[in-house]
Amino acid sequence: MVAEEDIEKQVLQLIDSFFLKTTLLICSTESSRYQSSTENIFLFDDTWFEDHSELVSELPEIISKWSHYDGRKELPPLVVETYLDLRQLNSSHLVRLKDHEGHLWNVCKGTKKQEIVMERWLIELDNSSPTFKSYSEDETDVNELSKQLVLLFRYLLTLIQLLPTTELYQLLIKSYNGPQNEGSSNPITSTGPLVSIRTCVLDGSKPILSKGRIGLSKPIINTYSNALNESNLPAHLDQKKITPVWTKFGLLRVSVSYRRDWKFEINNTNDELFSARHASVSHNSQGPQNQPEQEGQSDQDIGKRQPQFQQQQQPQQQQQQQQQQQRQHQVQTQQQRQIPDRRSLSLSPCTRANSFEPQSWQKKVYPISRPVQPFKVGSIGSQSASRNPSNSSFFNQPPVHRPSMSSNYGPQMNIEGTSVGSTSKYSSSFGNIRRHSSVKTTENAEKVSKAVKSPLQPQESQEDLMDFVKLLEEKPDLTIKKTSGNNPPNINISDSLIRYQNLKPSNDLLSEDLSVSLSMDPNHTYHRGRSDSHSPLPSISPSMHYGSLNSRMSQGANASHLIARGGGNSSTSALNSRRNSLDKSSNKQGMSGLPPIFGGESTSYHHDNKIQKYNQLGVEEDDDDENDRLLNQMGNSATKFKSSISPRSIDSISSSFIKSRIPIRQPYHYSQPTTAPFQAQAKFHKPANKLIDNGNRSNSNNNNHNGNDAVGVMHNDEDDQDDDLVFFMSDMNLSKEG
């Protein structure tokens, strides 16, 4: 127990030494960064770093809070601030800050602010962070802890010497000890020790006030406003942290936040040379400056300085001309490099008092400092697009020539609208500003200009049309045969009829369907994507319509049907059947919209009287007259139908019958004509038996000598029952029409 208590006391002593020596390194006037002379220099040697029992009497009384830690009470964070003391300045002094590009920014007048905070150190014993709580509980080694603290102190001393405040102090000492030359370029151009660097110790648990001083969080250079760096700090600040040392009571941490810019200058405004230079700069001002603290300057001060400037104007001008001739080339090259593109327009820094800016740089600044007007199209040019509030045309405006813009930029602004006159009544819009922001001509703009070129330039469009017509004339293969939907193409129908008449009996119905599909005009094939209905997509046949197809009844197996019904040869019977089907379709316009080849097919078994009437007709005209009549009727009937359905598709069957009489569901979307031999086809074939009986009765009444042939027909139908199940539509048609 005694050993543990001794170890705990040693650890507490090391914690007290940590707070005291860290504060001493930052605040002591004998630290290495203040070694301007050899007197009263306190050596931070190895003995001082290793001796943790020494108490420093130079520290203020506030440090006593952190000098006697017992391990039970909570230690607040200790804050040490390093600041630039301005209390010795009077109202005639002006404090300015130079940024990294050499531009001067006005900070304040001598009596406006008392301090400018440069650094803020945070020294704390952290016993609540997750890092400390997650640390393993090992036995504390006092010797190891002492070595770690010595390493921390040495690192802290090195860090202090590298901070910007040390450089400011060294230059301040040089300006004190050096010759007081008003024309010199020293950062501190004061006649005495008017400013100094000081430190103060604060309690981190209490709020830190910035009244009467420029706090660390306030950016002097306004280009840093609303900007953060990688460490989530304001852009004008930087931060350094030292690796913490672990103890059983908490982590010993040290961190610092400091200003990046430290090159301050102090000028006396009552100085004659400064007044002359300040007046010359004010005459050649390049925009608003960051001078918020100079608003209290009265007109009397200006009136006092102005006569002085007029009395010494001539000798000062001679001196200025000599300086300008010597430095003109150097100033031009330097300032052209120092002008940043990202520089703030409304908060530009003040120009250095002992330098003159060339006229070329001044001329460049005028268009830059001009405030941007978002409601003007011509942001690149000097004029707006139009001053007329009405919807005036852009072509009435004089063209604004821009060397980097495309010459067709004016017409391009109206591309998205319907017409040129449909633009907004305002002189511009945000869309036009967006297009004006691009200086280079892109590929899209070139394509759009080509597209707009033809309606805007009729001569070139006519030339393009002439070239296109010549191209068509030179290549006759490119001629387009265009036919309207209402007027079907003039196709030689007689050739098709002759082809059907000369078909050999050995050909089956599939070859006929293929011949129909091959004879289709490709110009009248419809695309399925053009249909807007939700019904099953039928197979579309050509817009012109042929007569009744030569079905199996015209072939060798069923040739007796034509003889029995027509009473003549097979060719004349086929012509009569086609003629009858055409007459029937012309009289029944109220039927379903099927072509003449299906004329009355779905309702053929409801018209037995008409069948007998047509069966009693004979061949009364010559073949030529019949062909002419057939062609005329087909030409007239073809115009009444726009499309037909393939004779073998399920859609043709379902569309021809009344839906209430069909005992099966409607077929779904079939992409091609199909023949499905399912049970429903047998039901559809039942009317064929009645048709055969009707045909036998008509033959027995009119043609008794052909009775045996009718029996043969029935025998043939029974033999070909399987085929009739598939191709029953053709049998029904011809048995009805014969």
Swiss-Prot record:
InterPro entries: ATG13, Atg13_N, HORMA_dom_sf. Belongs to the ATG13 family. Fungi subfamily. GO terms for molecular function: armadillo repeat domain binding; lipid binding; protein kinase regulator activity. Phosphorylated; hyperphosphorylated by the TORC1 kinase complex to repress the induction of autophagy in nutrient-replete conditions. Starvation and TOR inactivation results in ATG13 partial dephosphorylation leading to ATG1-binding. Rephosphorylated by ATG1 during prolonged nitrogen starvation. Also phosphorylated by PKA. PKA phosphorylation regulates the association of ATG13 with the PAS. Within this regulatory network, mitochondrial respiratory deficiency suppresses autophagic flux. Hyperphosphorylation in rich medium is impaired in the absence of VAC8. It is found in: Cytoplasm; Preautophagosomal structure. Residues 279-359, 377-462, 521-599, 690-719 are annotated as: Disordered. Induction: Translation is induced by nitrogen starvation. Translational repression during nutrient-rich conditions is dependent on a uORF (upstream open reading frame) present in the 5'-UTR of the mRNA; it promotes ribosome dissociation. Translational induction occurs in conditions reducing translation machinery efficiency, leading to ribosomes scanning over the uORF (leaky-scanning), and increased translation of the mRNA. It holds the Pfam family ATG13. Changing S581A: Decreases phosphorylation by PKA. The extended 70 Angstroms-longloop of ATG13 specifically binds the highly conserved innergroove formed by the armadillo repeats of VAC8. The gene is ATG13. GO terms for cellular component: Atg1/ULK1 kinase complex; autophagosome; cytosol; PAS complex; phagophore assembly site; vacuole-isolation membrane contact site. Residues 284-297, 306-338, 382-399, 417-429, 694-708 have a biased composition (Low complexity). Residues 432-520 are annotated as: Interaction with ATG1. It comes from Saccharomyces cerevisiae (strain ATCC 204508 / S288c). Activates the ATG1 kinase in a nutritional condition dependent manner through the TOR pathway, leading to autophagy. Required for autophosphorylation of ATG1 at 'Thr-226' and its dimerization. May also be involved in the regulation of autophagy through SNF1. Involved in ATG9 and ATG23 cycling through the pre-autophagosomal structure. Also involved in cytoplasm to vacuole transport (Cvt) and more specifically in Cvt vesicle formation. Seems to play a role in the switching machinery regulating the conversion between the Cvt pathway and autophagy. GO terms for biological process: autophagosome assembly; autophagy; autophagy of mitochondrion; cellular response to nitrogen starvation; Cvt vesicle assembly; cytoplasm to vacuole targeting by the Cvt pathway; macroautophagy; mitophagy. This is Autophagy-related protein 13. It comes from the Eukaryota. Changing S344A: Decreases phosphorylation by PKA. Keywords: Autophagy, Cytoplasm, Phosphoprotein, Protein transport, Transport. Residues 345-359, 534-558, 570-579 have a biased composition (Polar residues). The modification Phosphoserine is found at S344, S348, S355, S437, S438, S461, S496, S535, S541, S554, S581, S646, S649. Disulfide bonds: none annotated. Its main location: cytoplasm. Changing S535A: Leads to constitutive activation of autophagy.
